[in-house]
Amino acid sequence: MEYHHRPHSPPPSDDDVVVIQMNAAAIAAVDEWSSTNEVDDAAAGKGGGLTRRTFSQAYKMKHRTPLEFTWRQVALLSFQSLGVVYGDLGTSPLYVFSSISLDDPGEADFVGILSIILWTFTMICLVKYVFIVLKADDHGEGGTFALYSLLRQHVNFKGNMPVPVTHLASDINLKFHSKKRILTSKLLKFLEQSTKWQAVITYIVLAGTCMVLGDGALTPAISVLSAVQGIQSRSSSITQAHVVLLSVIILFILFFFQKHGTSKVSFTFSPIMILWFTFVAFIGLYNIIKHYPPILKAVSPHYIIIYFIRNKRAAWETLGAIVLCITGAEAMFADLGHFNKSSIQMAFSVIVYPSMILAYAGQAAFLVKNPSKLSTTFYSSTPEPLFWPMFIIATLAAIVASQALISASFSIIRQSIALGCFPRVTMKHTSGKHEGQVYSPEINYFLMVACILITVGFKGGPEIGQAFGVAVIFVMLFTTNLMTVVMLIIWESNIALASLFFVFFFSIEGIYMTSLMNKILQGGWVPFAITAFFLIITLSWTYGRSKKGEYELANVMEREEFIKTVTTRSRVPGVCIFCTDMMNGIPPIVRHYVQHVASLRELMVFVTIRVLPVRTVLPEERFIIDKLEPVGVYRCIVQYGYMDNHNMEGDDYVASVIASLKEIAENDDEILVLDSALINGSTFVLGRTIIKMGTRHNCLKRFFINNLYRFLQKNFRSNMSSLKINPGKTLQVGMLYEI
C-alpha cells in the first residue's frame, strides 16, 4: 500500500515534504513510531551513526520558519498587542487593593502588600512568562495546547488517550519538532511506557483549558463591575443595585455584538489601552509624590516578612486578593500566535511593566495616608479633575479586557474541536482578513448567561475576586507542570535547572493556591463549577469516541470480504464519498450499507479528516491518497493543523479529491474514468452510529456512554459538517454499536 502526498508544485526536497511508502501491515501498527525510533536509537548508541530525523527536518514548512522582523514591525506589533494581550493584566489595578480585607491596616501593612505585589508581578509575569514560557512555542503558536502539541510531537502517546492518537506509517519521520537530536532519556522512556502519566498530562491540559473558559466568564464580570462601581462616589442615591444593573446592560451589549465580530472596532483597542496605561502610570506617580514618596522602599523583600509577622493568618488570607495582580499573565503565552515573542516582550517591558508598578505603588502610597479608602482604592486615589475621563477610559479598558477573554474562549473551543476532544459547535468567521477571529453562538450564549449570573450573584463583593483568583492560579500551576516536562524532554535542560524552575514557581503559585482554597465556599467554587461542566462534556465526548473507535477496529471489514462484496454488486457512474473516522481498514458501517443497496458507484473513496499535532498544514500536504482493491476504490486522508479552517465546500472538496486521484493515476484510461465519475455526480455517505453499552460495564461508564455521549452526539454537529455538503447529495446510514 502506498500513501501519496498530493503535490501542487514541483517535487519538493526531503526537507519539505515526507513521502514514505509502507506496506499495509506497517500502516496498521499503531506502535510503529515507538519501535522504529527504538531501533534508530539503538543503532546510534552503538556507534552506527544513525540519527533520527527530527520533526522539523522531515515536516518542514515555509510558513513555519520563524520570520525576521524589523524593529519597526516589532514596534507596531507591540502596539497592537496592547489591545489584545494586555487588557486583562492591565486592568488589574481596578480591583486588587479593593479585594483585600484587612482590619485596621497601617503603613507597614501597605508597604508589605506592595512588596508582595511587586515581587509576584516581577517573578511570574516578567521572569516566568516573558523570559521562559514564551520560548516554548509550537511553530509560533502559544497556549496550553501548544505545549501539549510539542509533547505529542516528541513523546509517543499510547493507549486510549482522551485526545485521539492518529498514527500512520508515513509519520515515522514526522515525530519531532526540535532541530537537535533527541537523546534517549530515562524520562522520555518512562513517559512513552507509562500510559497513566500520559493520561495525567492530557487531563492537566484538558482541565487547564476548561479553567480558561471559566476565566472567560469571570473576567468580564469583575472588570466591568470594578470599572462601573466608581460612579457610586458621584451620588449617594446610586446604590450597588444600580451598579449591578448597569454592568449587566454593558455585558449584555458586549455579548450581543460578538456575532458581528471585532474587526470594525479592534483598531481602537490598542489606543484605548495606551490611554489606560498612560493614565494609571501618571496618576500613580502623582500619588507617590503627593502622599508617600518612601513607598518605593517596598522593592526590598524584607517588608514581606514584616507583613506576615504582623498579620500572620490574615496576611496569608489576603494572598487570595493579591494574586489578582497577575491575572492575564497567561494571555501573553496564549496569544503568542497573533504576534511574536519580541513584540510581546517589548510591550511588556517598555509599557506594561513600568505602568503597573507605578499604578500599584501610587495606590499603596495613597492608602498609607487614607487607609479607610481601601474598599474604593482605585477611584478614591484618582484626582478629582480626572475622575470622569478615568471613568470612561476604565470602562472602555474593562470592555477590551473582556473582549480578549471572550475571543480567547472561542479560539480554545476551536482548537479543542480540531483535536477531537470537544463536540463540534457552530464556528463562524467574523473577519475575511484574520482567520483567527471566530464566533460560536453556543459558547457565546453560555458565557453570557454565566457572566450575568456571576455579576448578579456576587453583586461586586470580594467573593468575585476570590473566584477569579482560583481560575488564574490553577491555569498557572498547569503551565508550570507542563513547562517542566518540556524543559526536560524537548529543551534537554539540565535536570537541576528544570527542578529549580519547578520548585521555585510551583512554591509561589502553591502558596497562593492554599490561600484561595480557604475561600472555596465564599466564591472559589464558581470556576470549579464551570470547569467541571466543560470537563464533563470533554471527557464524555472523548470517551465515547474512543469506545466507538475500539468497536470499529474490532469489527473492521476484512479485505477479502470487502473485495467480494464490491465485485458482486453492479456499478453505476458517479462518485461515492464514504466519510469515516478510521484511517486504516473498512469500518463496519460500510458492511451495513452495502447489504442494503443493489448497486455501488464506479468510484468509491473512503475519506478521513485528520488533525496533526501542528499549528497548520500547507495546501500541498492536505491530501494523502491511497489505492485500495478492487479497481475504483481509494482512500483519502485530509490533513489539517489544529489552527486550520475546515471550510471546504462539498463540491469543491470532491473536485480536489478527484484532482489528487488523477495525479497518482497510472494511465490515461484511469484519468478518463475519474473525469467521467466526477461529471456523473457525487454522493456522500455519512455514518450515524448509536453506541449502547451493556450491563457488564459499571454504572458510571454506562451513564457516560448511554446518556451523556448519546446526548452530545444527538445535539451537536457532526465531524463532517465542516465540508458544507449539499443535503440533497447526502445519505446517512444508521447503525447500533453494542459494546
UniProtKB/Swiss-Prot annotation:
Pfam families: K_trans, K_trans_C. High-affinity potassium transporter. GO terms for cellular component: membrane. Residues 1-81, 134-198, 258-268, 340-347, 407-437, 491-494, 541-739 are cytoplasmic. One of its GO terms (molecular function) is potassium ion transmembrane transporter activity. Belongs to the HAK/KUP transporter (TC 2.A.72.3) family. This is Potassium transporter 26. The chain crosses the membrane at residues 82-102, 113-133, 199-219, 237-257, 269-289, 319-339, 348-368, 386-406, 438-458, 470-490, 495-515, 520-540. The gene is HAK26. It is found in: Membrane. InterPro entries: K+_transporter, K_trans_C, K_trans_N. Residues 103-112, 220-236, 290-318, 369-385, 459-469, 516-519 are extracellular.
